[in-house]
C-alpha cells in the first residue's frame, strides 16, 4: 500500500509552447546583446565572412573584365544633349581653399632626422575598428590628437550609417571634419611622397593615408586577401628608415619601413589627409608649397604616375593612378586606355571597392556594356557598394532603361542615405 506522503518523480512532459517561448527569449536576448558595440564588432565580421564565403561558392569571383577597344556605333546614339548636365562625379562640395602664393625666396627649412608626435591614448574597446570601419576609426584617433572627444561611431553614423558599407572615401572623411568636428579644418591631396609626410609631421601635424593591406583571412576561394586600409602616421626616424603608425586593426605604435609604406601607398595614388586647427594653416601652406593648389597638386600626381608607367610598364597600380589623374582632368579617352592597361595587367579583386575612376571613364567614353560588366563584378565582390550601384544605374540610363536606373540609384541610398550623387541622379532622371 502506497504511503500517502510519497511523492513519485515524474518526468515533465515536453511543452512545445515552453520550448518555443524559450527560443524566442533567447533570440531577443541575442539580438539585444548584438547591439552592444563590443560584441557586435566581434561577431559581425564572422557572420559577414560566412555569408560571403557561401555566396561565392555558387558564384565564384572572376578577374575584372577587360573592356573592348572599340565602342559600337549604336552605343553612342543614346546620349545626353549638350544643354543637359552630365551626372555628377564627386561628392560633397569642397569648401573654399586659400590660394597658395609663392614667395620669391622660398628656401626649404631642414627638418630633424627624427620626429615623434604624442598620439592620443589608445583604448582597445573604443578605438579598435568595427567591421569595415577603419576610416572613421582612424579619423577619430586623428581628431582626438587635437582634443576632440568623440569616437568612430560618432563619425560612421554620419558618413557610413550602414555597417555593411565596406568603404569610406577620403572626401567623405574631410567632409565630416569640415562640418562636424567643430573647429578643425581638413584637406586631402594626392601624389604624396615620403618627404612630404615627414615635413608635415615636423610641422606638428599627424598624417592619415590610405594604403594597401593584407587581411588575415579568406572571404572566398582564391581570395587574394588584398584590401584598402587607413593608417595614421605620427612619427618618423631617418636612422631606422621607419615611420611610427597607429593602426585600428593591428593596434597603436606600429612601425613600417619607408620603402614598404611607399609601396603600399602607391595603390591609392598616394593620397593623404591632413587635419589641422585654423591657426596652423599658414604653416601648412608653406610646407605643401605648390601642392596646396588642388589642380597643381593633381597635375604633379599625373606626371608622377606617367613617369612610373614609363619606368615600370608592368606596374598595374601606376597605370591605374594615371587613369585616375586623367579622369580628374576629364581626359576620359586617355584615362580609359590607362585603366584598360591596368586591368589587363591584373588588379586586385577588391580594387573597385575603393576607387571608382574606371566607372566614370567608361561612362564618358560610351563603353556602356563594359561599364555594366565592370559594375556587375564590383557588386559581386562588394554587394553594398553605393558607388558601383550609382554607375550601374547610369549605364542603364544611357541604354534608355530609366526604371532600372532609378532602382539602382534608390538601392545606393539604402546603403548610404546621405549619398548626394544618388539623390542628384534621381532628380536628374525624373526631370529629363
Task: List PLM regions with ranges.
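N-terminal Lys/Arg-rich, disordered targeting/topogenic segments
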Residues: 1-17
Amino acid at each position: 500500500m502506497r504511503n500517502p506522503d510519497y511523492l513519485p518523480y515524474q518526468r515533465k512532459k515536453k511543452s512545445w509552447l515552453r520550448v518555443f517561448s524559450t527560443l524566442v527569449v533567447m533570440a531577443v536576448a541575442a539580438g539585444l546583446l548584438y547591439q552592444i558595440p563590443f560584441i557586435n564588432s566581434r561577431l559581425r565580421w564572422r557572420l559577414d565572412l560566412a555569408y560571403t564565403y557561401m555566396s561565392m561558392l555558387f558564384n565564384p569571383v572572376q578577374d575584372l573584365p577587360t573592356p573592348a577597344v572599340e565602342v559600337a556605333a549604336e552605343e553612342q546614339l543614346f546620349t545626353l544633349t549638350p544643354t543637359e548636365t552630365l551626372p555628377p562625379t564627386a561628392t560633397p562640395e569642397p569648401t573654399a581653399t586659400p590660394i597658395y602664393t609663392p614667395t620669391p625666396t622660398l628656401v626649404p627649412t631642414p627638418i630633424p632626422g627624427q620626429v615623434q608626435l604624442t598620439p592620443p591614448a589608445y583604448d582597445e574597446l573604443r578605438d579598435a575598428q568595427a567591421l569595415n570601419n577603419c576610416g572613421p576609426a582612424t579619423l577619430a584617433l586623428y581628431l582626438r590628437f587635437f582634443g576632440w572627444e568623440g569616437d568612430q561611431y560618432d563619425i560612421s553614423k554620419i558618413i557610413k550609417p550602414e555597417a555593411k558599407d565596406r568603404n569610406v572615401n577620403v572626401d567623405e572623411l574631410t567632409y565630416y571634419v569640415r562640418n562636424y568636428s567643430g573647429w578643425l579644418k581638413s584637406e586631402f591631396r594626392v601624389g604624396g611622397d615620403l618627404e612630404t609626410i615627414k615635413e608635415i609631421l615636423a610641422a606638428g601635424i599627424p598624417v592619415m593615408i590610405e594604403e594597401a593591406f593584407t587581411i588575415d583571412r579568406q572571404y572566398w576561394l582564391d581570395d587574394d586577401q588584398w584590401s584598402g586600409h587607413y593608417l595614421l602616421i605620427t612619427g618618423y626616424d631617418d636612422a631606422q628608415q621607419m615611420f611610427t603608425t597607429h593602426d585600428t586593426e593591428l593596434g597603436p605604435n606600429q612601425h613600417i619601413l619607408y620603402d614598404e609604406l611607399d609601396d603600399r601607398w602607391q595603390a591609392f595614388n598616394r593620397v593623404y589627409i591632413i587635419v589641422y586647427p585654423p591657426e596652423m594653416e599658414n604653416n601648412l601652406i608653406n610646407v605643401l608649397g605648390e601642392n596646396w593648389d588642388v589642380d597643381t597638386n593633381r597635375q604633379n600626381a599625373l606626371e608622377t604616375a606617367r613617369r612610373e608607367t614609363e619606368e615600370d610598364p608592368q606596374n598595374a597600380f601606376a597605370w591605374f593612378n594615371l587613369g585616375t589623374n586623367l579622369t580628374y582632368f576629364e581626359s576620359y579617352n586617355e584615362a580609359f586606355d590607362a585603366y584598360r592597361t591596368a586591368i589587363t595587367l591584373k588588379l586586385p579583386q577588391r580594387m573597385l571597392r575603393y576607387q571608382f575612376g574606371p566607372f566614370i571613364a567608361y561612362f564618358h567614353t560610351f563603353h556602356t556594356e563594359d561599364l555594366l560588366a565592370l559594375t556587375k563584378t564590383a557588386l559581386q565582390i562588394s554587394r553594398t557598394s553605393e558607388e558601383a550601384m550609382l554607375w550601374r544605374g547610369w549605364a542603364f540610363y544611357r541604354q534608355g532603361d530609366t526604371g532600372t536606373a532609378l532602382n539602382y540609384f534608390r538601392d545606393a541610398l539604402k546603403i548610404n542615405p546621405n549619398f548626394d550623387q544618388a539623390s542628384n541622379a534621381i532628380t536628374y532622371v525624373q526631370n529629363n
